[in-house]
């Protein structure tokens, strides 16, 4: 009996020793694993806490234009820019011991495990704020052991490398609050239409309850349930002595008013402008569209919301709703190149294709001011005379000819001045000028004005047969308005990252690239399209809208069978309109042919309403005299016609009109400039000049 007892005792002691040994070994192994994890975490250092954030675009007045979010609305804000109650409420309901543990709340974990065992189900969570933050940053929300291991590993790394406030700030900026809102700032805007720092304490307490289950605790889904959870949170704050009982009662009783959910989904403002701003961002920052849309950038654009609204409303009010005709519109500040308003089509939802910046259309006669700028620079003056008559131009020695015509087949059948030729849009005068200068000159001049299209040096180029982008034509006119300084259409003035660091700022430096005197004289002549005193064999091209205008503008219209243009400016604003059909169908309706001019005139008047009149100021080297616009003579005593016209100093007309009938002009009177020898033979034949 004793032998059996001793044997059992020895066996029991061996078993106990074995368990002690195995327990000690397991403890050492666990400690070794734990220390290894700690050391690896320490070696790897701070994990990245970068998360996708919404990029916001602002209008020139600082108001919000739009945002990009890739489906996740997220705006990072520091703790100091949150109502303190959101912090207290979140800690109270999610992790009471947050400031005391090192990432894991072991007591809470044990309690949760015991509760789960009793219920034979997962009934209580034990994840700390740090664990949830790690899960939000790095992990998928599956329930595998691998995910649990990685969560623990990232939790350790976060606790090792970031302060409690940094972890809490990150958590509050990444947790999901429902309806696409990630982070407390997005949630504040979504539910209450305000910034997180402006939340009331009651609103903050309600929001703190949503992340546990956005599909159940969102007030949009179940307001009663959301209020019940808010009450639970407030009482927990009271229990943890974060607030008094009186304060708790007040918060529970406070009525809450929510933003209507349907207001959160709205049409993007100025969508065509928005797309151009995004394209410019890609170019300026060297980033992909996805990088831009998820980097939390603050993009300050150039759009003037008032002018944008005027442009959109003017187009809608002018164009017949039943017509399929399209419109491209842009307005530019000549002083900076800033695009103030842009419309790329009549309905962005139906067609996001931008007819202002992406399409190329024949500019027609709107190209003529660029030609005449070069002519003035080359010795022409506003009173240079050339005959307007039906003309067949011999292009080369092979006998090829070019026979342009004037609108409706009207001709003066006598010499007219450059001033009048521009106001009446005489095509014969334009082609003669183009050929006299050399067809390559207009190609080079267009490049100086910022035209990027490849233009062919054809005789017809003077009449705008080579397609260009409408916005580049408006920009070219803006360069005439600013006296010849180089500008480019600009959509973005400044970009900062989420922390406020400047990533890009438009330098706003503009080099003088055009002849200032020639640019001013050209701009001055362009005011003639609205001046009925310049009527001749036909009316000035702006006669139909002259009575709509209350200011001095310079401008030029243009027409092809499929395109209708109007571009014009004053010193502060340049704007242009193109109308036509996407498939190049002809514009047959008289009403549709008038759209471009009407839209331009009404926009300019409304956009500048309340602004002081700004005069075109001549630069040094330019002088003004009164002339007879038909003969080109200076207006002396007794001369009936008097039109104030600017000239490059020294090129004013020598002849004077005294009222008597002047000698009839029958030949072209061109600058006494020697032409290239290659042009002399055919030019002399039709020009009637002899050497």
UniProtKB/Swiss-Prot annotation:
GO MF entry, a single one:
serine-type D-Ala-D-Ala carboxypeptidase activity
Region (Disordered), start-end ranges: 663-691
Q: Where are the transmembrane segments?
A: 20-40
Listed Pfam families:
Transgly, Transpeptidase
What Enzyme Commission number(s) does the record list for this chain? Answer: 2.4.99.28, 3.4.16.4
For the biological process aspect of GO, one term held by this record is: peptidoglycan biosynthetic process
- Topology in the lipid bilayer: Single-pass membrane protein
* Pathway(s) of this molecule: Cell wall biogenesis; peptidoglycan biosynthesis
Q: Where is this region: Transpeptidase?
A: 327-605
Residue spans, topological domain Extracellular: 41-691
Q: Which coarse location class applies to the principal site listed for this UniProt protein?
A: membrane
List the stretches on the Cytoplasmic face of the membrane: 1-19
Q: Which keywords, in A-to-Z order, does the entry hold? A: Carboxypeptidase, Cell membrane, Cell shape, Cell wall biogenesis/degradation, Glycosyltransferase, Hydrolase, Membrane, Multifunctional enzyme, Peptidoglycan synthesis, Protease, Signal-anchor, Transferase, Transmembrane, Transmembrane helix
User: Do you know which InterPro entries this protein is assigned to?
Assistant: Beta-lactam/transpept-like, Glyco_trans_51, Glycosyltr_51/Transpeptidase, Lysozyme-like_dom_sf, PBP_transglycosylase, PCN-bd_Tpept
Q: Which domain of life is it from?
A: Bacteria
Effect of knocking it out? Answer: No visible phenotype; due to the redundancy with PbpF. Spores have normal heat-resistance, cortex structure, and germination and outgrowth properties.
Q: Where is the composition biased (Basic and acidic residues)?
A: 664-691
Gene3D superfamilies assigned: Biosynthetic peptidoglycan transglycosylase-like, DD-peptidase/beta-lactamase superfamily
Mind telling me which GO cellular component terms the entry cites?
outer membrane-bounded periplasmic space; plasma membrane
Family indicated by similarity: In the N-terminal section; belongs to the glycosyltransferase 51 family.
Which PANTHER family does the record cross-reference, listed alphabetically?
Answer: BINDING PROTEIN TRANSPEPTIDASE, PUTATIVE-RELATED, PENICILLIN-BINDING PROTEIN 1B
Q: What does this protein do?
A: Involved in the polymerization and cross-linking of spore peptidoglycan. May be required for synthesis of the spore germ cell wall, the first layer of peptidoglycan synthesized on the surface of the inner forespore membrane.
Its recorded name reads Penicillin-binding protein 2D
Q: What species does this protein belong to?
A: Bacillus subtilis (strain 168)
């Amino acid at each position: 009996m004793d032998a059996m007892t001793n044997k059992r005792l020895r066996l029991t002691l061996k078993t106990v020793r074995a368990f002690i040994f195995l327990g000690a070994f397991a403890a050492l192994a666990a400690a070794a694993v734990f220390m290894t994890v700690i050391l690896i975490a320490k070696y790897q250092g701070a994990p990245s806490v970068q998360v996708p954030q919404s990029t916001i675009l602002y209008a020139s007045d600082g108001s919000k234009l739009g945002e990009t979010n890739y489906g996740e609305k997220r705006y990072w804000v520091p703790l100091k820019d949150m109502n303190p109650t959101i912090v207290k409420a979140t800690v109270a309901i999610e992790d009471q011991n947050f400031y005391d543990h090192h990432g894991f709340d072991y007591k809470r974990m044990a309690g949760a495990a015991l509760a789960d065992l009793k219920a034979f189900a997962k009934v209580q969570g034990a994840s700390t704020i740090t664990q949830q933050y790690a899960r939000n940053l790095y992990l998928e929300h599956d329930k595998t052991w691998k995910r649990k291991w990685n969560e623990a590993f990232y939790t350790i790394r976060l606790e090792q490398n970031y302060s409690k406030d940094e972890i809490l700030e990150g958590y509050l900026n990444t947790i999901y609050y429902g309806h696409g809102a990630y982070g407390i700032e997005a949630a504040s805007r979504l539910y209450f239409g305000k910034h997180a720092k402006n939340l009331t304490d009651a609103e903050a307490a309600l929001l703190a309850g949503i992340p546990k289950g956005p599909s159940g605790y969102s007030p949009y889904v179940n307001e009663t349930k959301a209020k019940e959870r808010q009450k639970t949170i407030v009482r927990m704050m009271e229990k943890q002595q974060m607030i008094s009982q009186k304060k708790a009662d007040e918060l529970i009783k406070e009525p809450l008013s929510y933003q209507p959910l349907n207001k959160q989904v709205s049409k993007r403002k100025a969508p065509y402008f928005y797309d151009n701003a995004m394209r410019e961002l890609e170019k300026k920052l060297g980033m992909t569209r996805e990088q831009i849309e998820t980097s939390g950038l603050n993009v300050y654009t150039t759009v003037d919301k008032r002018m944008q609204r005027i442009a959109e409303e003017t187009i809608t009010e002018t164009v017949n709703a039943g017509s399929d005709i399209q419109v491209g519109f842009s307005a530019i500040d000549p002083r900076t190149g800033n695009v103030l308003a842009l419309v790329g089509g009549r309905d962005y939802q139906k067609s996001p294709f931008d007819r202002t910046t992406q399409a190329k259309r024949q500019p027609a006669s709107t190209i003529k001011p660029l030609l005449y700028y070069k002519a003035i620079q080359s010795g022409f003056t506003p009173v240079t005379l050339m005959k307007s008559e039906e003309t067949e131009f011999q292009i080369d020695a092979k006998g090829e000819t070019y026979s342009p015509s004037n609108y409706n087949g009207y001709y003066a059948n006598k010499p007219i001045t450059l001033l009048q030729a521009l106001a009446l849009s005489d095509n014969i005068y334009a082609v003669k000028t183009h050929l006299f200068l050399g067809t390559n000159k207009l190609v080079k001049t267009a490049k100086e004005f910022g035209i990027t299209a490849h233009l062919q040096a054809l005789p017809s180029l003077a009449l705008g047969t080579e397609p260009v982008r409408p916005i580049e034509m408006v920009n070219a006119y803006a360069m005439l308005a600013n006296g010849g300084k180089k500008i480019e259409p600009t959509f973005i003035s400044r970009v900062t990252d989420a922390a406020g660091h400047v990533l890009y700022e438009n330098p706003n430096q503009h080099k003088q690239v055009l002849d200032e005197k020639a640019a001013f004289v050209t701009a001055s002549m362009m005011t003639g399209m609205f001046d009925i005193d310049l009527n001749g064999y036909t009316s000035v091209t702006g006669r139909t809208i002259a009575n709509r205008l209350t200011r001095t503008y310079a401008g030029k219209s243009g027409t092809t069978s499929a395109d209708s243009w109007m571009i014009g400016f004053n010193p502060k604003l340049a704007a242009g309109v193109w109308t036509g059909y996407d498939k190049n169908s002809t514009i047959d309706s008289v009403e549709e042919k008038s759209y471009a001019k009407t839209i331009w005139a009404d926009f300019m008047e409304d956009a500048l309403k309340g602004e002081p009149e700004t005069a075109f100021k001549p630069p040094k080297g330019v002088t003004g005299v009164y002339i007879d616009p038909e003969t080109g003579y200076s207006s002396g005593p007794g001369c009936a016609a008097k039109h104030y016209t600017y000239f490059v100093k020294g090129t004013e007309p020598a002849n004077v009109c005294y009222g008597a009938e002047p000698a009839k002009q029958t030949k072209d009177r061109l600058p006494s400039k020697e032409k290239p020898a290659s042009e002399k033979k055919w030019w002399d034949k039709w020009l009637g000049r002899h050497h």
